[in-house]
């Protein structure tokens, strides 16, 4: 029997507990001062439900606008539009006419493989087995917009793929696995639909050499390591030794900068380290902000600390009935805006990728500095001395 709920060593946390095994032990029994804000996760759960319904029943997602998901969230146009990108992408890649449910097509495929590890269980959004090509396709829908999910070497994707191969007993039938991530609301340089391939041999090596030993270690280890994986760690609100060490080092770097006359006087090594530390420090700062905000909401005074509680900015919205009134006042043509879908949204349409391959392009943009483990391709710049020749007198 497959356990209910999320595994404490599930796929969504694999990237974190493999990097920081101590986060699992530190999280046990920890009750954060601030409750997780489900205003971000709840619409994603509803979008998953919309996509699941559309894939199972073959209908269009827009028909669900105005209904309520099981978690009580009202399904609106934004949720439907995002879910439809996922549905279109799946159908475009795998012709529904070829689907045999439970044979080569699986929606919300659950797995639990205690022979690998008691806590090895989860649910894959959509799975397609291409037997002639000896290829398994594992699809994962991401509703979030704030954190872009990279598909290359994605720990959650590999976790789910391993679980599905084991659950369906396909290790001997499949040579290659394609992991698909669809993130319609996040702006990614590769678009909202991304994929990455891995051989079953490589995946099996990762499963037995990295994942399972990592799961065992996470159950007993107190070893912590700070990184961008801290964004989703429950202990980011607690006394995490790794985050505390980062904050101490930031303080030391600020002292060095002061002695040198400013952060712009730091050496390349010092500046690079400072930027890396601050990227992680912002995670702790965000957790502190959320805790402070929760206290202020309950009436605790924060004025003495040079802060105050204010109303959040909101854009104006129309009251009920405004749509009909606007059409009557301005006419339908002037009241509504019609424009071409973005290349990212066109990608999700049938034959969309073929169209954008011909018609879409990336204009030249600026540059920015990111952490080294970011999957974007690095840009090389020559030193000025290597570009310009000395003027001959």
PLM-predicted stretches and their roles:
Residues 178, 208-280, 377-393:
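Short, charged, low-complexity amphipathic alpha-helix
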Residues 55-59, 143-146, 161-169, 216, ...:
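Hydrophobic/aromatic-lined pockets within catalytic cores
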Residues 283-393:
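Extended, charge-rich alpha-helical segments
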Residues 99-217:
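Mg2+/Mn2+-dependent nuclease catalytic core
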Residues 79, 83, 87, 271-292:
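Short amphipathic alpha-helical coiled-coil/interface segments
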Residues 62-65, 170-178, 295-299:
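Short, glycine/acidic-rich hinge or "gate" loops at secondary-structure transitions
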Residues 119, 153, 226, 271-277, ...:
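Active-site-proximal structural scaffolding
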Residues 1-138, 178, 189-192, 278:
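Metal-dependent nuclease catalytic cores that hydrolyze phosphodiester bonds in DNA/RNA
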């Amino acid at each position: 029997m497959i356990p209910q709920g999320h595994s404490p060593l599930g796929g969504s946390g694999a990237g974190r507990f493999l990097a920081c095994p101590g986060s699992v032990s530190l999280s046990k029994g920890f009750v954060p001062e601030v409750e997780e804000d489900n205003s971000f996760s709840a619409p994603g759960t509803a979008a998953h439900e919309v996509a699941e319904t559309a894939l199972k029943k073959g209908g269009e997602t827009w028909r669900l606008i105005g209904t309520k998901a099981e978690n009580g969230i009202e399904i609106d146009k934004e949720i439907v539009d995002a879910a439809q990108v996922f549905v279109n992408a799946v159908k475009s890649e795998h012709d529904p006419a070829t689907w045999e449910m439970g044979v080569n097509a699986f929606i919300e495929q659950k797995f639990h493989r205690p022979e690998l590890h008691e806590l090895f269980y989860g649910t894959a959004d959509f799975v397609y087995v291409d037997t002639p090509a000896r290829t398994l396709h594992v699809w994962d829908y991401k509703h979030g917009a704030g954190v872009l999910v990279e598909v290359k070497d994605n720990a959650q994707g590999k976790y789910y793929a391993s679980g599905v191969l084991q659950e369906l007993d396909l290790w001997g039938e499949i040579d290659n696995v394609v992991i698909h991530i669809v993130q319609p609301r996040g702006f990614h340089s590769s678009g909202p639909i991304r994929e990455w391939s891995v051989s079953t041999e490589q995946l099996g090596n990762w499963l037995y050499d990295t994942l399972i030993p990592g799961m065992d270690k996470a159950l007993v280890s107190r070893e912590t390591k700070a990184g961008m994986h801290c964004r989703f760690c429950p202990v980011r609100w607690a006394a995490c030794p790794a985050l505390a060490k980062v904050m101490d080092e930031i303080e030391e770097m600020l002292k060095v900068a002061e002695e040198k006359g400013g952060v712009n006087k730091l050496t390349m090594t010092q500046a690079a380290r400072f930027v890396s530390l601050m990227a992680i420090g912002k995670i702790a700062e965000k957790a502190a902000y959320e805790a402070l905000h929760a206290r202020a909401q309950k009436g605790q005074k924060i004025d003495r600390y040079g802060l105050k509680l204010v109303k959040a900015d909101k854009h104006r919205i129309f009251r009920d009935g405004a749509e009909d009134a606007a059409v009557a006042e301005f006419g339908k043509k002037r009241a509504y805006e019609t424009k071409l879908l973005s290349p990212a949204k066109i990608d999700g349409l049938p034959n969309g990728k073929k169209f954008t391959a011909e018609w879409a392009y990336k204009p030249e943009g600026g540059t920015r500095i990111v952490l080294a483990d970011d999957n974007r391709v690095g840009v090389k710049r020559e030193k000025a001395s290597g570009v310009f020749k000395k003027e001959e007198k």
